[in-house]
Amino acid sequence: RYNVDESIPHLNSSWRQKICLWSFSVVDHFDLSRDVVAVSMSLFDRFLATRGNRCNGSTARLASLAVLHIAIKVNEVQRIKLGTLANFSRGQFGPRDIEEMEWNVLTSLDWKIHPPTSMSFVSHLLLLLPPQIDDACKEEIYSLSRYITELSFCESAFVETNPSSVAFAAILISLED
């Protein structure tokens, strides 16, 4: 399991991967859709971009809590209390800290918090497969494409890649297998 309070000495691909894996562990713990992580990481990346991609480890950890909470509220019926989420910081942040960071994120992004995700593109693109392909095969393509897109969330090299391009590439790779 990954904890949000792990050391993030400087913002690079390893900190992003830790935040992404931690986010997956939280959504898995609460049995939420893994698509929440795609939205959360998009919010995180766009928030950092408004700050010139400059952020210390503490701010990155707090922002990761805030964007995950926003993504859960926007995409899930189930709610996670701020106090519960704050517990994942092992006392480093309280509910009020997360709430203030949420406001900071929302205003920085002009409330544009529902980005298209690579998984939504995968779902739509798979509808274009020929009807001759059986459902079991389509499900296999979907599962592998989903896995590939989830890997892309954790990789900083894909931050500036359009979600539709990631989805298309994931499907092409899935079709090769």
Locate each region found by the language model.
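Extended serine/threonine-enriched, polar tracts that run as long, contiguous segments within proteins
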Residues: 143-177
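Short acidic, glycine/proline-enriched loop segments that cap or flank alpha-helices
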Residues: 55, 133-137, 154-162
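Acidic, Ser/Thr/Pro-rich regulatory low-complexity segments at or just upstream of the first helical elements
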Residues: 1-65, 69-124, 132, 140-151, ...
